[in-house]
Amino acid sequence: MTEPLSTRPVLLQLHHVSVAGANRAPRLSNISLSMQAGERLALIGPNGSGKSTLLRVLTSELGTTTGYIHLNGQPLNSLSRHERAKRIAILAQNDTPDLRLRVAEYVALGRIPHHGFSTPANDRQLIEEALDDTGLLPLRHRLLGTLSGGERQRAALARAFAQTPQLLLLDEPTNHLDPLARAQLLSLVRKRGISTLAVLHDLPLITPFADRVAVLQQGTLLRWGTPAHALSADCVKSVFGMESFTVSHPINGSPIRIFEAPELH
């Protein structure tokens, strides 16, 4: 039986976090939210709302102007770069791996923060598990350059799994993937049970994937809660300019959210 979110320990906590951009204009303003261990949190909002900025803060690529961030009870800014690499993995949009690497070699890069370029027996087992969990064992000897876009994204996810982080960050991981590959990728993350903060644009994928949703607009946290709360019709209309409604699945009766863009005139 899955433990309820409310009883799990807090993994990530942001308290009144702000980030200033050019001319001191706020890129993030007074963001406070938390994630429980094992939670999947979807971060959504229109372009320019601060989603990628928040990820860059969590990877310490950007510093905060005010506020603090704790990861597993420790101040994030107290951790060395090496220690952060052990604890936080990111699947970035602009990942450009060496396409001459074989899949298993690429996945093994996830162990570097822990043991450098040596590969002890336990690391080899973790790499095998990551390949297996992502369905890549049959492709382990293939060159990255010969993979499809979906297969290459799964390889990047396997590398992140092999890193065994406390927190997985996904920056629009389903971009450029076909519908089946999108659903499969998020399903792999869900089955792994890893604490995940994912920037997502594909609204229909959010409810099946996320435990909670944080909605950003113009650098502020507009709404934070369950998918039903965060993706209410009024919020979707206000933030994305789209209509939304709920229908029942024709086979199992579960609720399905439908999002509809207004016609252009």
Predicted ranges, named:
Residues 44-46:
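The feature captures the beta-strand-to-loop junction immediately N-terminal to the Walker
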Residues 59:
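Helix-to-loop junction immediately C-terminal to a conserved catalytic motif
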Residues 67-75, 84:
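Conserved ABC transporter NBD signature motif
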Residues 108, 122-139:
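Conserved ABC ATPase "signature" region
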Residues 143-147, 151:
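Conserved ABC ATPase signature
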Residues 168-172, 177:
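Catalytic Walker B motif of ABC-type/P-loop ATPase nucleotide-binding domains
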Residues 233, 237-265:
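ABC ATPase nucleotide-binding domains
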